[in-house]
């Protein structure tokens, strides 16, 4: 079955004019032999569809009745004319729209060319409109009036507080019969300063608010820096940064403080002495039994210990080792 399919594919490729090796084993990432579809498309005689062509024209070269036959190619200006035509649904060319003679009763209208809608912001900044400048001036006036009212209210509150503080000690000294004199009303606040007549167009209400907020923050920082701060904890990094440059001096010790060094001893002799001390009682007990020295009654009557060196079996290796060690 696979051989039949392979034969069929080879015959089909030969009819088209493509070799099977160039299709399967060609590693060329470009050209007509990149894929089977491109190879078939190059060999087949297909009629390409005509492409739509647009012509970019400037506003100065508008349609004129003198050369009505020319400029028949559709351009992007036709798209704008079609968009402005709200009454009719059919699409027409700019030449057909402009060929209509204008009515005598209609006033001449001067339309500006259709603007191209782009997703990028315009680099040229437009000048602020007079309505916008008037709105910003009104906002500035309102903000300044509110700030003046706040300042006047603060001044009145401060005066009331000072009068209450002055009257509180004097009220205790007066008798109950005497009536407390009512403080006169505070004087009216001073009128707000006149606003400048000429305001720069670029300044707005938000910019003014930001500037005054920055001034208040800077004033608060200056007050905070005026008071002396408490000394903080010392920084250990600053203390330890000069540790490498510290030099130590040598100090002589007294003979009493110096500990005597142990003398160099032979390790074999030290081990032999320890073994002799450990197994001395055993040799003594064996010598007494061999000599026939009677044990005391207290030792004979006493019960043997459950655990101890007597449980171990005696061998002659340890005895020979002790005898071979030279006496120090």
UniProtKB/Swiss-Prot annotation:
Q: What is this protein identified as? A: Mitochondrial fission regulator 1
Residues annotated as coiled-coil are 131-167
Q: In which tissues is it expressed?
A: Ubiquitously expressed with higher expression in testis.
Q: Provide the residue span(s) of the region labelled Necessary and sufficient to promote mitochondrial fission.
A: 178-299
Annotated GO biological processes are: aerobic respiration; mitochondrial fission; mitochondrion organization
| Gene ablation phenotype (knockout) | Mice are viable and fertile. However, oxidative DNA damages appear in the testis, associated with a reduced expression of genes encoding enzymes with oxidoreductase activity.
Compositional bias per record (Polar residues), positions renumbered to this chain:
116-127, 166-181
Q: Work out whether the entry's keyword set contains DNA damage.
A: no
Q: Which domain of life is it from?
A: Eukaryota
| Keyword presence, Chaperone | no
- Family classification: Belongs to the MTFR1 family.
Please list the residues that make up the transit peptide in this record.
1-48
The UniProt entry's GO CC annotations, sorted and at most eight, read: cytosol; mitochondrion; plasma membrane
Q: Where is this region: Disordered?
A: 95-135, 166-235, 283-312
Phosphoserine PTM sites in chain numbering:
119, 129
Where does this protein have compositionally biased stretches of type Basic and acidic residues? 95-106, 288-298
Q: Which N-terminal stretch is annotated as signal sequence?
A: none
The record's section on InterPro entries has: Mtfr1
UniProt keywords, alphabetically: Coiled coil, Mitochondrion, Phosphoprotein, Transit peptide
> Pro residues composition bias: which ranges?
183-196
């Amino acid at each position: 079955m696979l051989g039949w399919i392979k034969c069929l594919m080879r015959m089909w490729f030969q009819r088209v004019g493509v070799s099977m090796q160039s299709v399967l084993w060609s590693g060329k990432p470009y050209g007509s032999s990149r894929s089977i579809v491109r190879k078939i498309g190059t060999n087949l005689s297909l009629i390409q569809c005509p492409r739509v062509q647009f012509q970019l024209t400037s506003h100065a070269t508008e349609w004129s009745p003198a050369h009505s036959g020319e400029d028949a190619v559709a351009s992007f200006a036709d798209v704008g004319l079609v968009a402005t035509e709200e009454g009719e649904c059919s699409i027409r060319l700019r030449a057909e729209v402009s060929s209509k003679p204008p009515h005598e009763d209609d006033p001449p209208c001067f339309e500006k060319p259709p603007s191209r809608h782009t997703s990028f912001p315009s680099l040229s900044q437009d000048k602020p409109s007079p309505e916008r400048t008037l709105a910003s001036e009104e906002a500035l006036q309102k903000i300044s009036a509110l700030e003046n009212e706040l300042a006047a209210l603060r001044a009145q509150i401060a005066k009331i507080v000072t009068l209450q503080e002055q009257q509180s000690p004097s009220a205790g000294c007066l008798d109950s019969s005497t009536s407390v004199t009512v403080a006169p009303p505070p004087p009216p606040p001073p009128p707000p300063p006149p606003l400048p007549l000429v305001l720069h167009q670029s300044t707005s209400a938000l910019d003014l608010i930001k500037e005054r907020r920055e001034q208040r923050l800077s004033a608060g920082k200056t007050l905070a820096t005026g008071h002396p701060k408490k000394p903080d904890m010392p920084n250990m990094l600053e203390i330890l940064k000069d540790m490498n440059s510290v030099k130590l001096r040598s100090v002589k010790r007294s003979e009493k403080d110096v500990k005597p060094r142990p003398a160099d001893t032979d390790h074999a002799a030290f081990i032999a002495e320890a073994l002799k001390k450990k197994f001395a009682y055993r040799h003594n007990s064996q010598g007494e039994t061999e000599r026939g020295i009677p044990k005391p009654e207290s030792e004979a009557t006493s019960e043997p210990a459950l655990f101890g060196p007597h449980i171990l079996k005696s061998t002659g290796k340890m005895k020979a080792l002790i005898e071979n060690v030279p006496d120090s």
